């Protein structure tokens, strides 16, 4: 993922997670072999990094320690995180810094669009920090970024991964009206974990948001993702799948939670590849058009390839219904 520049001059001395400093250190479990990946060293990785830096962008891939950064950047795949690198919320799983955000960078939409064009992206993912400080939660900024990409690189398909726009009337409607190709909003975890893992959010608000997207534009692909290994029970994951299908969500991603620091929520369990495969099988039986379920699955991992498969799955379903 990628975010815009940090205006904090003394970044090296900034306390990244002041809201978590009071927490006791948690146990860090040793990662199993199926989680480990090679360090990024390829030429493609270096070229992607150079492009990102040349447009005054900062990578949340690096900050979050995403395990897929080497693979994605080698292929010049990127997710741009807009509206700064400081979030107004403090989720227990997230490595993005929390605090008082800077003013929006009004040049960001054009800068992101330039990077998309220079990298030759056929599919791009745009995400953001939560901006509860903004009247519209950043909806207009999402809109401007989408429009800028459409102008600079008309052939690029656009996937957005949005915050929940909690208590921001009209924000969702504005973003949907900008016509992204895929609307993604992650539930992150099962509802019983929300108070400890995602305290600033509301589970059923997120479900309703995804449902509302389909009401506004029935043709728009919708997507959501969760992490497992946070202490959830299997039956809770299956119920979450049912909730998403009630909202007519097309695409589900399930990946292993990895603990950023000792101050973050601990990994309760490393879910095995066989368990991930089982979740995938069940999810397909519940009617999802696409499911990606594996230890290293992340919302934007293989997003371009998955979008092509998602379109093909819908076409196949429509043809079957017409017979």
Curated annotation (Swiss-Prot):
SMART domains: Elp3
Enzyme Commission number(s) of this protein: 2.8.1.8
Keyword 4Fe-4S carried by entry: yes
Protein name: Lipoyl synthase
Catalytic reaction annotation: [[Fe-S] cluster scaffold protein carrying a second [4Fe-4S](2+) cluster] + N(6)-octanoyl-L-lysyl-[protein] + 2 oxidized [2Fe-2S]-[ferredoxin] + 2 S-adenosyl-L-methionine + 4 H(+) = [[Fe-S] cluster scaffold protein] + N(6)-[(R)-dihydrolipoyl]-L-lysyl-[protein] + 4 Fe(3+) + 2 hydrogen sulfide + 2 5'-deoxyadenosine + 2 L-methionine + 2 reduced [2Fe-2S]-[ferredoxin]
GO molecular function annotations of the record: 4 iron, 4 sulfur cluster binding; lipoate synthase activity; metal ion binding
Co-factor: note: Binds 2 [4Fe-4S] clusters per subunit. One cluster is coordinated with 3 cysteines and an exchangeable S-adenosyl-L-methionine.
Keywords assigned: 4Fe-4S, Cytoplasm, Iron, Iron-sulfur, Metal-binding, S-adenosyl-L-methionine, Transferase
UniProt binding sites for [4Fe-4S] cluster 1: 61, 66, 72, 300
Signal peptide feature range: none
Radical SAM core domain segment(s): 73-289
Record InterPro entries: Aldolase_TIM (IPR013785), Elp3/MiaA/NifB-like_rSAM (IPR006638), LIAS_N (IPR031691), Lipoyl_synth (IPR003698), rSAM (IPR007197)
Principal place of residence: cytoplasm
Gene transcribed to yield this protein: lipA
Binding positions ([4Fe-4S] cluster 2): 87, 91, 94
Transmembrane segments: none
Co-factor requirement: [4Fe-4S] cluster
Family note: Belongs to the radical SAM superfamily. Lipoyl synthase family.
GO cellular component, one term: cytoplasm
Protein's organism: Sinorhizobium medicae (strain WSM419) (Ensifer medicae)
Annotated metabolic or biological route of this protein: Protein modification; protein lipoylation via endogenous pathway; protein N(6)-(lipoyl)lysine from octanoyl-[acyl-carrier-protein]: step 2/2
NCBIfam families reported in the protein's UniProt record: lipA, PRK05481.1, PRK12928.1
Compartments, as annotated in UniProt: Cytoplasm
């Amino acid at each position: 993922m990628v975010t815009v520049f940090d205006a904090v001059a003394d970044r090296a001395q900034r306390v990244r997670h002041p809201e978590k400093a009071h927490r006791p250190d948690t146990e860090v479990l040793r990662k199993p072999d199926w989680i480990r990946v090679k360090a990024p060293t390829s030429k493609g990785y270096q070229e992607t990094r150079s492009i990102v830096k040349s447009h005054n962008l900062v990578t949340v891939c690096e900050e979050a320690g995403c395990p897929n950064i080497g693979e994605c950047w080698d292929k010049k795949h990127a997710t741009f995180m807009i509206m700064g690198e400081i979030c107004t919320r403090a989720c227990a799983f997230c490595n993005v810094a929390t605090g008082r955000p800077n003013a929006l960078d009004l040049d960001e939409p054009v800068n992101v669009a330039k990077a998309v064009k220079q990298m030759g992206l056929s599919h791009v993912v745009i995400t953001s920090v939560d901006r509860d400080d903004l009247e519209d939660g950043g909806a207009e900024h999402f809109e401007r970024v989408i429009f800028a990409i459409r102008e600079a690189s008309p052939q690029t398909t656009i996937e957005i991964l949005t915050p929940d726009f909690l208590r921001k009337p009209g924000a969702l409607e504005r973003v949907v009206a900008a016509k992204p190709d895929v609307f993604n909003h992650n539930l992150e975890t099962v509802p019983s974990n929300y108070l400890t893992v995602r305290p600033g959010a509301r589970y059923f608000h997120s479900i309703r948001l995804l449902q509302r997207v389909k009401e506004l534009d029935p043709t728009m692909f919708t997507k959501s993702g969760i992490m497992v290994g946070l202490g959830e029970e299997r039956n809770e994951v299956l119920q979450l799948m049912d909730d998403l299908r009630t909202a007519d969500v097309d695409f589900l991603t399930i990946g292993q939670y990895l603990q950023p620091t000792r101050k973050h929520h601990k990994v309760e369990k490393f879910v095995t590849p066989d368990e991930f495969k089982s979740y995938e099988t069940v999810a397909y039986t519940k009617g999802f058009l696409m499911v990606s379920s594996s230890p290293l699955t992340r919302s934007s991992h293989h997003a371009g390839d998955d979008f092509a498969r998602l379109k093909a799955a819908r076409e196949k379903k429509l043809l079957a219904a017409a017979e």
